[in-house]
């Protein structure tokens, strides 16, 4: 049994209703988000966001207003009928932006001088790496443009998966007006790409180091003041 599998619900936003049959039904305890909702008499708003379904669903708890996760088949953030009957307009608008394709066009190269990676990681190319971008792409730089409009799943194994998650979180923050009511809201964000990258390349890889370098420069942090200005209107 998969931790967040739920065949009693239907997926929303993916290629079909089977994709996205997920919920917190199998979780046998409450979370901090559940306790927050209970304490506020369900006035607090709770939303979970992640690339992985379990990274979005489980932290947000049983009583979340929504949980959204990434569907690598469609390139959309999706949810299930456990939370709602239709996707909100703002989620459809976000999906229509095709953020994944925009990020693919940036390709993936190192952010710092190669000497930095030599200090913190092993050699750039190791036999045990799973080569998620094909056997012909061994080590930096990685050409991601080949996946534009074709394979939306590869984003998860790059630092741009973090950027995609952050952009979705920003959209939720603004559209749902989180933090503007009298009750405390909770936006549960999980960054899944470090796990994908670690499994694909190893914890001491150049890719892992570069992922954490890029995490520090996320658009969510760079545009903090811009986000707050939009949100506070």
Where are the language model's segments positioned?
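Active-site-proximal segments of metal-dependent phosphoesterases and phosphodiesterases across multiple
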Residues: 203-216
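Composition- and surface-driven signal marking solvent-exposed, interaction-prone regions
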Residues: 183-185, 201-204
């Amino acid at each position: 049994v998969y931790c967040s599998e739920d065949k009693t619900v239907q997926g929303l936003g993916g290629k079909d209703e089977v994709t996205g049959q997920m919920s917190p039904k199998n979780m046998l305890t409450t979370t901090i988000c559940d306790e927050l909702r209970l304490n506020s008499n369900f006035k607090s708003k709770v939303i979970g966001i992640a690339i992985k379904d379990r990274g979005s669903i489980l932290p947000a708890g049983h009583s979340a207003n929504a949980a959204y996760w990434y569907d690598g088949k469609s390139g959309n953030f999706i949810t299930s009928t456990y939370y709602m009957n239709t996707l909100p307009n703002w989620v459809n608008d976000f999906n229509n932006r095709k953020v994944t394709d925009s990020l693919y066009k940036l390709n993936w190269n190192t952010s710092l001088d190669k000497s930095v990676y030599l200090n913190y990681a092993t050699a750039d190319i190791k036999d045990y790496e799973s080569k998620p971008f094909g056997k012909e792409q061994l080590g930096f730089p990685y050409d991601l443009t080949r996946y534009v409009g074709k394979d939306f799943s590869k984003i998860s194994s790059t630092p741009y998966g973090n950027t995609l998650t952050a952009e979705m979180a920003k959209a939720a923050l603004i559209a749902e007006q989180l933090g503007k009511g009298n009750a405390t809201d909770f936006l549960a964000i999980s960054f899944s790409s470090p796990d994908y990258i670690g499994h694909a390349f190893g914890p001491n890889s150049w890719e892992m180091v570069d992922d954490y370098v890029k995490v520090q420069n996320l658009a969510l942090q760079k545009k903090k003041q811009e986000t707050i200005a939009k949100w506070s209107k």
